[in-house]
């Protein structure tokens, strides 16, 4: 697989032109552009495994033709993932219990040089598999991999030490530690993620009052932004993400950030006094003066009720993975807020995907 590296700048310029045109009706200022490394930028990858007689290998599917193709190296993924791909398969081939009915391998790597390898099977994992997988882990560690091996099958998950890795992200000269849990969302392009955090910190400099973040994941943004606010309140519904966020808060010595496990809808009910929640015992919502809100919605954008909720705040930091639904939301948001800053983050080079950020201020 070869990347069109020589065309990178031209492709990024086309994205900028598209985003500029989409934001033009909303009087957006000039868009800041944050580029990506041109190869080995993706920190996670998933591959199906294709078995052919006595051989097997990584495959992917062409999105246009749906035809499978063999993948022996993957320049999109981190150098660590590529090294693991080439080391792992020969070791798996030595043990039938490790490769029989293996149908997928997921890799999650970090800038801190740690990696999780998840092996997915169409069979029950036995003690024989466990013994072989432990031996596999030992062999990889002897080749200088800091690796966690996880086995997955129907209603089964086996891990030997832990199901997470601790990433270290350099942001504005400071290292932030982020626990990343296997099979949970993490930002795929670590270098661009660092640039997103630096941009968000820059936008919110000299902020007054408190910050609310909806669906904070492992605390990626709220931990870095806490330095700019008196207090930060963040919501998240996934238990593993909440646990990782709590670890990250402690590890980064952030003392003004509170995570609560509830949906945006539940939080709105609690904030408006519509109903009480046991999960909020010991948390005085009235003590928060949140006049800034951070949202990073899925591709569908914000639903109409959340748009109304967001409009109650003086300042909105909006990270979008879909500029079209962002513009749908801006039809309403632009009635109450103006765009102060706009950014394009090239999370996914060589694709049409555009990650963008807006800093909106009440008119």
Curated annotation (Swiss-Prot):
InterPro entries recorded: MeTrfase_TrmA_AS (IPR030390), MeTrfase_TrmA_CS (IPR030391), SAM-dependent_MTases_sf (IPR029063), TrmA_MeTrfase (IPR011869), U5_MeTrfase_fam (IPR010280)
Catalytic activity: uridine(54) in tRNA + S-adenosyl-L-methionine = 5-methyluridine(54) in tRNA + S-adenosyl-L-homocysteine + H(+); uridine(341) in tmRNA + S-adenosyl-L-methionine = 5-methyluridine(341) in tmRNA + S-adenosyl-L-homocysteine + H(+)
Record: active site: 321 (nucleophile), 355 (proton acceptor)
GO molecular function terms listed in the Swiss-Prot or TrEMBL record: rRNA binding; tRNA (uracil(54)-C5)-methyltransferase activity, S-adenosyl methionine-dependent; tRNA binding
Organism superkingdom: Bacteria
Residue sites binding S-adenosyl-L-methionine per the record: 187, 215, 220, 236, 296
Listed EC numbers: 2.1.1.-, 2.1.1.35
GO terms for biological process, alphabetical: tRNA methylation
Alphabetical UniProt keywords: Methyltransferase, S-adenosyl-L-methionine, Transferase, tRNA processing
Cellular component GO terms held in the UniProt record: cytosol
Pfam families, sorted: tRNA_U5-meth_tr
PANTHER family found in the cross-reference section: TRNA/TMRNA (URACIL-C(5))-METHYLTRANSFERASE (PTHR47790), TRNA_TMRNA (URACIL-C(5))-METHYLTRANSFERASE (PTHR47790:SF2)
Family: Belongs to the class I-like SAM-binding methyltransferase superfamily. RNA M5U methyltransferase family. TrmA subfamily.
Main function: Dual-specificity methyltransferase that catalyzes the formation of 5-methyluridine at position 54 (m5U54) in all tRNAs, and that of position 341 (m5U341) in tmRNA (transfer-mRNA).
UniProt protein name: tRNA/tmRNA (uracil-C(5))-methyltransferase
């Amino acid at each position: 697989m070869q990347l069109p590296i020589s065309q990178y700048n031209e492709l990024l310029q086309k994205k900028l032109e598209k985003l500029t045109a989409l934001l033009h009706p909303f009087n957006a200022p000039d868009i800041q552009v944050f580029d990506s490394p041109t190869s080995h930028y993706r920190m996670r990858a998933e591959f199906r495994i294709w078995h052919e007689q006595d051989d097997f290998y990584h495959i992917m599917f062409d999105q246009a033709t749906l035809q499978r193709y063999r993948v022996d190296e993957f320049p999109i993924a981190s150098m660590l993932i590529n090294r693991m791909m080439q080391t792992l398969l020969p070791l798996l081939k030595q043990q039938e219990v490790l490769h029989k009915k293996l149908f997928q391998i997921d890799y999650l790597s970090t800038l801190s040089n740690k990696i999780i390898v998840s092996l997915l099977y169409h069979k029950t994992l036995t003690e024989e598999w466990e013994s072989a997988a432990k031996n596999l882990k030992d062999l990889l560690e002897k080749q200088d991999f800091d690796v966690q091996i996880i086995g997955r099958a129907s209603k089964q998950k086996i891990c030997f030490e832990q199901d997470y890795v601790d990433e270290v992200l350099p942001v504005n000269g400071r290292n932030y530690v982020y626990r990343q849990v296997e099979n949970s969302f993490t930002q795929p392009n670590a270098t661009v993620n660092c640039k997103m955090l630096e941009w968000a910190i820059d936008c919110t400099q000299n902020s007054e009052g408190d910050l609310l973040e909806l669906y904070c994941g492992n605390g990626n943004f709220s931990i870095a932004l806490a330095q700019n606010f008196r207090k930060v309140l963040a919501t998240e519904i996934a238990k593993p993400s909440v646990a990782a966020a709590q670890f990250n808060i402690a590890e980064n010595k952030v003392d003004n950030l509170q995570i609560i496990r509830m949906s945006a809808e539940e939080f709105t009910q609690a904030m408006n006094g519509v109903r009480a929640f046991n999960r909020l015992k010991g948390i005085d919502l009235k003590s928060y003066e949140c006049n800034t809100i951070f949202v990073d919605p899925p591709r569908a954008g914000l639903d109409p009720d959340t748009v109304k909720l967001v409009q109650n705040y003086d300042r909105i930091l909006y990270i979008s993975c879909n500029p079209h639904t962002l513009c749908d939301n801006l039809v309403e948001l632009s009635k109450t807020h103006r765009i102060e800053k706009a950014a394009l983050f090239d999370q996914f080079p060589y694709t049409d995907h555009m990650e963008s950020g807006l800093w909106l201020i009440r008119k």
